[in-house]
């Protein structure tokens, strides 16, 4: 496609008006009724209910683990950022669950085919939490990139000087920006009138394609940036081990923490990017098949839209699993906060359990590894004080 044609297509997509119609006929009612009640859409709704329910449970448990005292060994900004991402997924799962149940109940109780028509503005309000969650996830990933950049550049003083304030300010900014963008997006595309099916984007699918392309490109760029940050921290970590006398214990701890956090974030964001590309592929398929569709044929976009939205609950299920599996500290915190989900006899779990009380009579035993670690930390603290002098 020539560059001029591509620019014209992009401009047309970005300024596409809502596909709502001002007046509907009996034929419109029948089209909407068929789109709502056909067996394929009913199956998609049941799949939505299944994944959204498990996604909401998974996100809730993950947030509980991050806020529980068992995860206090994790970096506070990591907990804040991960909890923010999980909260965004939780909002979307709850709203998608509600929408699926609502549509299912409406299908079973509808007496008139015209009851399947939706007011465009009510549809926009109904789908607003989902749109908010999509932007909150993207903004959250960008916020993580900013926070990790600060931690990398200021690793010598980051742990001691205001890191909690940095995390809270960034997360507050994340939600402020995503709320403004989501409200603007909904207001821009919620024209008066009626739609045949209530999708997340009440507009032509071309708009969704270009929006998803932009978000996917931004996410891939952020992922590449995370990989570069990981390599930078690993190089500094190697230099720290070679020249230990030139680095304090706080600096060494922060470098190790940076590497551990990046190894959590990269797999999690990779999963989200892969799922996003799957959704983008579905949108592109529809845009190619229905390139010149008018408002009344856009209802065929509904199945593609619902399949794409499955990305959100699937990510809500996969994201906590990947984060827990990739990080031992987070895994141990999960075992302690949610013992009913894990094997209490696991060797990892035993590391988090309190030590047994000493016996009444003296016996010769080796000291617990945790005691040795405590004494080792005390020893290094003393050495650090000597180095400072």
From Swiss-Prot:
Which Gene Ontology MF annotations are present?
G protein-coupled receptor activity
On whether Transmembrane helix is a keyword of this UniProt record, the answer is yes
Keywords annotated in UniProt = Disulfide bond, G-protein coupled receptor, Glycoprotein, Membrane, Receptor, Transducer, Transmembrane, Transmembrane helix
Q: Where are the transmembrane segments?
A: 46-66, 82-102, 124-144, 168-188, 209-229, 269-289, 304-324
UniProt GO cellular component terms: membrane
- Name the domain of life: Eukaryota
The record's section on InterPro entries has: 7TM_GPCR_serpentine_rcpt_Srab, GPCR_Rhodpsn_7TM, Nematode_rcpt-like_srab
Pfam families given for it? 7TM_GPCR_Srab
The residues exposed to the Extracellular compartment are 1-45, 103-123, 189-208, 290-303
Using the UniProt annotation, give the residues that carry a glycan (glycosylation sites). 23
- Give the way it sits in the membrane: Multi-pass membrane protein
**UniProt-annotated location(s):** Membrane
What intrachain disulfides are recorded? 123-198
Give residue ranges on the Cytoplasmic side: 67-81, 145-167, 230-268, 325-389
Annotated family: Belongs to the nematode receptor-like protein srab family.
Q: What is this protein called?
A: Serpentine receptor class alpha/beta-14
* Gene it is expressed from: srab-14
């Amino acid at each position: 496609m020539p560059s001029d044609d591509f620019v014209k297509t992009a401009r047309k997509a970005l300024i596409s008006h809502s596909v709502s119609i001002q007046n509907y006929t009996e034929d419109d009612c029948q089209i909407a009724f068929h789109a709502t009640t056909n067996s394929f859409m009913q199956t998609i709704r049941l799949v939505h209910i299944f994944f959204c329910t498990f996604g909401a449970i998974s996100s809730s448990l993950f947030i509980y683990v991050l806020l529980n005292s068992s995860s206090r060994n994790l970096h506070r900004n990591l907990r804040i950022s991960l909890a923010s991402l999980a909260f965004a997924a939780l909002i979307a799962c709850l709203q998608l669950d509600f929408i699926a149940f609502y549509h299912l109940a409406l299908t079973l109780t509808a007496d008139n085919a015209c009851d399947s028509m939706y007011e465009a503005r009510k549809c926009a309000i109904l789908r607003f939490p989902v749109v908010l969650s999509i932007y909150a996830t993207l903004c959250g990933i960008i916020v993580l990139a900013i926070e990790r950049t600060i931690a990398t550049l200021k690793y010598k003083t980051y742990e001691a000087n205001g890191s909690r304030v940095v995390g809270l300010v960034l997360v507050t900014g994340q939600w402020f920006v995503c709320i403004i963008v989501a409200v603007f997006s909904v207001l821009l595309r919620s024209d008066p009138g009626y739609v045949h099916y209530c999708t997340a984007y009440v507009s032509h699918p071309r708009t969704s394609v270009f929006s998803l392309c932009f978000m996917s490109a931004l996410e891939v760029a952020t992922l590449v940036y995370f990989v570069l940050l990981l390599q930078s921290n690993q190089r500094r970590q190697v230099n720290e081990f070679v020249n230990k006398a030139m680095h304090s214990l706080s600096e060494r701890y922060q470098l190790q923490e940076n590497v551990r956090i990046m190894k959590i974030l990269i797999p999690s964001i990779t999963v989200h990017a892969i799922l996003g590309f799957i959704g983008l592929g579905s949108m592109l398929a529809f845009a190619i098949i229905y390139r010149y569709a008018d408002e009344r044929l856009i209802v065929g976009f509904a199945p593609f839209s619902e399949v794409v939205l499955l990305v959100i609950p699937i990510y809500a299920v996969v994201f906590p699993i990947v984060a827990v599996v990739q990080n031992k500290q987070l895994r141990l915190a999960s075992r302690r906060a949610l013992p009913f989900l894990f094997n209490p006899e696991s060797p990892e779990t035993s590391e988090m359990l309190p030590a047994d009380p000493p016996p009444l009579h003296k016996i010769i035993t080796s000291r617990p590894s945790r005691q040795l670690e405590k004494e080792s930390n005390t020893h290094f603290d003393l050495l650090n004080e000597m180095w400072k002098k």
